[in-house]
């Protein structure tokens, strides 16, 4: 097994999605393993209760420390990876973080629920990640796309390295426009350069369109790009209506 990912959750059935498609095939090939552990199984009370009212009052319930910490400690006996908590205090997840985490051989993800976790659990957490400044039902909803993004970059998961190096965000830009057959669809034609067979012109077109899309749709990303002289010339050329 190349990579081991363990997920601590109250809802393990939500992660059955990883049994399908690209990630499912990678698991079948033993390129990686994704295991879930039900935090509720580590409770010490007869009702298997994992939450309680917050000290000081307030709305909602808080996940108690004991079952979470005992679950972490149990998993740690077979997985020495960092504990990653999906929570609002964390750094916003992006492609650069996905690249970094995909190089880890072992990872443990902790999914919170309700109004959050007891503060004392944080001393057992190595990294906190957020998917954005909005509210979701639980950490599971954040964990699924994060794990999927990481797994796609593990060698052998995709058919070729090129499959992910040309995708949006991998190099900090949006992916160029894509087309497939038919060549003509209700008056709309595939750009001629893509059916020309001229590989260098196709490369330039794709690169220019990638930058222009990023500039127009995600100016925040575009501002961070270090453009070469060729890049600036290509952008100017295609923005002025040039076609190959």
UniProtKB/Swiss-Prot annotation:
UniProt GO cellular component terms: cytosol
GO biological process entries: tRNA N1-guanine methylation
Keywords, in A-Z order: Cytoplasm, Methyltransferase, S-adenosyl-L-methionine, Transferase, tRNA processing
GO molecular function: tRNA (guanine(37)-N1)-methyltransferase activity
Transmembrane segments: none
Pfam family, one: tRNA_m1G_MT
Residues binding S-adenosyl-L-methionine, per UniProt: 112, 131-136
EC number(s) given by UniProt: 2.1.1.228
InterPro entries, sorted: Alpha/beta_knot_MTases, tRNA_m1G_MeTrfase_C_sf, tRNA_m1G_MeTrfase_TrmD, tRNA_m1G_MTases_N, tRNA_MeTrfase_TRMD/TRM10
Sections of the chain in a coiled coil: none
Location in or out of the cell: Cytoplasm
Catalysis performed (reactions): guanosine(37) in tRNA + S-adenosyl-L-methionine = N(1)-methylguanosine(37) in tRNA + S-adenosyl-L-homocysteine + H(+)
Annotated function: Specifically methylates guanosine-37 in various tRNAs.
Assembly description: Homodimer.
The family this protein is said to belong to: Belongs to the RNA methyltransferase TrmD family.
Protein name: tRNA (guanine-N(1)-)-methyltransferase
Species whose genome carries this gene: Clostridium kluyveri (strain ATCC 8527 / DSM 555 / NBRC 12016 / NCIMB 10680 / K1)
Lineage: Bacteria, Bacillati, Bacillota, Clostridia, Eubacteriales
Gene (UniProt): trmD
């Amino acid at each position: 097994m190349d990579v081991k990912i363990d997920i601590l959750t109250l809802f393990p059935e939500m992660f059955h999605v990883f049994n399908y498609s690209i990630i499912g095939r990678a698991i079948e090939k033993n390129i990686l393993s994704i295991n879930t552990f039900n935090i509720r199984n580590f409770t010490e009370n007869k009702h298997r209760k994992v939450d309680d009212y917050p000290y000081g009052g307030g709305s909602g319930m808080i996940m108690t420390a004991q079952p979470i910490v005992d679950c972490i400690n149990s998993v740690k006996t077979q997985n020495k990876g960092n504990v990653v908590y999906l929570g609002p205090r964390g750094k916003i997840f992006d492609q650069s973080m996905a690249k970094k985490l995909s190089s880890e051989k072992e990872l443990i993800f902790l999914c919170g629920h309700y109004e959050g976790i007891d503060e004392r659990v944080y001393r057992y957490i190595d990294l906190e990640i957020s998917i954005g400044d909005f509210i979701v039902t639980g950490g599971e909803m954040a964990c699924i796309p994060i794990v999927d993004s990481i797994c796609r970059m593990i060698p052998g998961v995709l058919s070729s390295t090129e499959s992910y190096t040309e995708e949006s965000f991998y190099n900090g830009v949006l992916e160029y426009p894509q087309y497939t057959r038919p060549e003509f669809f209700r008056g709309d034609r595939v750009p001629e350069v893509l059916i020309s067979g001229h590989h260098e012109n196709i490369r330039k077109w794709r690169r220019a369109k990638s930058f222009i899309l990023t500039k127009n749709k995600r100016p925040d990303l575009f501002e961070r790009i270090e453009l070469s002289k060729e890049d600036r010339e290509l952008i100017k050329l295609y923005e002025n209506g040039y076609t190959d």
